[in-house]
Amino acid sequence: MKTQVEFRSSKFPPYEGEQEQINPGLWGKRLDEYFVRKLSEKGIKTEEIIAEDWGWYIPVQNEGFRLAICCGHQDGDDDEFVCFTDPSTPVVKKFFKKIDATAQLTRLTEAMQQILSADPEIKEVVWKGPT
């Protein structure tokens, strides 16, 4: 299952001071706000965006296990971004059991694919499996 996407867009520049919230040279809060808005239009509910040292974390409402989209500017040109799901594989280990996350990940990645492909300002979209 492909749960990581890289793309280019000048649509998501950093906010002033954003790099102090995470790390120098990294940003993506505008991208996460965009995903929150677009996911909501598709009936996928999210929670408050969280700053991480590598970028931004969007918790997705889900029962049974943690589900999220992680996004940020990728090292390189100012228009390079990467997003991946958490979890990155369809099997979630929780305590002593395994949970099949295929349905939830499929719904989330399909929504992400639709959002990215529908926007003409987002280019060079490449999906990859977990690394």
Where do the PLM segments sit?
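Acidic, low-complexity intrinsically disordered regions
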Residues: 23, 50-52, 123
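Short, intrinsically disordered low-complexity segments
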Residues: 33-67
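Amphipathic protein-protein interaction modules
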Residues: 54-108
